[in-house]
Regions:
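Long, hydrophobic, well-ordered secondary-structure blocks that form the structural core
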Residues: 193-194, 217
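Membrane-proximal extracellular/periplasmic loop immediately following the first transmembrane helix
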Residues: 2-117
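Generic transmembrane alpha-helix motif of multi-pass integral membrane proteins
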Residues: 194-195, 278-280
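Short helix-to-coil transition segments within interhelical loops
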Residues: 195-201
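Hydrophobic transmembrane alpha-helix segments characteristic of membrane transport
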Residues: 188-192
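Secretory targeting signals
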Residues: 2-29, 106-185, 206-279
Length: 280
């Protein structure tokens, strides 16, 4: 969990100081991505490209120019996606070729690209989905509110990017723990005694299952909440209300960063419970 900041000398900085600098740079661009904001990004991008550093072939000087764009870089990436050649195409330098931008076209391209991809018989999207599924995807794209609100959101973005690691690690560790809950009776050759007792097949078994699920619940939520608050405490809580499309342009889920976090947390929990039950 960390960010990189390119300073005025073209050198990379990391650590909490880099986080603070990136937050400050991106907060300067906070606001709705309307016509005025998009035009400002295009103009600033063109101004930087016209500098000696922006035109230099020297990697060090070129990095200085890249550093100047860090404040609006996520917005520039959206322009790359919107004005790309198609739904599945990407070119880092697309935004550099855009001299005039339209708010309507910027958001409209997202819908146009997915429609073309789904209806082009020569593309994989045409045969990948049924007509009802295509209609649903397009409806979801059209239902997304615009303009987007931009704010520093690196904490939430990195949290969502890495959130799947903890459940996978938890499944691995808890799998070993859960595996012994019932198998130990057979290992110790006590199963005949255990299951022949008055409550061996009922209350005792039920208690073991409940204890196993409780263990999964406590370990999972403790680990996930600690990781989440550590990440957000270090990188920042700002940007919770930003839509996920600020970083995942093609997403058909019209939810915010914090809603995606809640969804990911519960999906991971259900997955852990299922695998724990399966292991037991």
């Amino acid at each position: 969990v960390d960010v990189k900041w390119v300073n005025e000398q073209g050198e990379s900085e990391r650590g909490f100081g880099a986080v603070q600098k990136l937050r400050e740079a991106q907060n300067a661009w906070e606001g709705y991505l309307d016509q005025e904001a998009l035009t400002k990004v295009i103009q600033e991008n063109a101004r930087i490209n016209a500098t000696p550093e922006g035109q230099s072939k020297n990697p060090k000087k070129s990095d200085i120019a890249v550093g100047w764009k860090q404040g609006f870089d996520p917005i520039r990436e959206l322009i790359n996606r919107s004005y790309g050649a198609g739904f599945r195409s990407y070119d880092y330098y697309t935004a550099d070729a855009v001299s005039v931008i339209s708010e309507e076209t910027f958001y409209g391209n997202r819908i146009k690209h997915v429609k073309n991809w789904l209806n082009d018989k020569n593309d994989v999207g045409y045969s990948l989905y049924s007509e009802k599924e295509k209609e649903y995807i397009i409806d979801q794209y059209e239902a997304l509110d615009a303009p987007f609100y931009f704010d520093y959101h690196d904490g939430w973005y990195q949290l969502l990017e890495n959130l799947g690691f903890i459940p996978m690690l938890g499944i691995l560790i808890l799998g070993f723990v859960m595996a012994g809950i019932f198998s130990n009776e057979f290992k110790w050759k006590a199963d005949a005694v255990y299951f022949s007792t008055l409550h061996g097949r009922t209350k005792a078994t039920s208690t073991k299952i409940k204890a196993g699920l409780l263990l999964v619940t406590v370990v999972y939520w403790t680990a996930m909440l600690i990781y989440s608050f550590f990440t957000l405490g270090y990188l920042g809580f700002e940007g919770a209300g930003c839509v996920v499309q600020l970083r995942v342009w093609k997403s058909l889920y019209n939810i915010t960063m914090w809603q995606a976090w809640i969804l990911a947390m519960f999906c991971g929990y259900i997955g852990n419970l299922f695998l724990a039950a399966l292991t037991m």
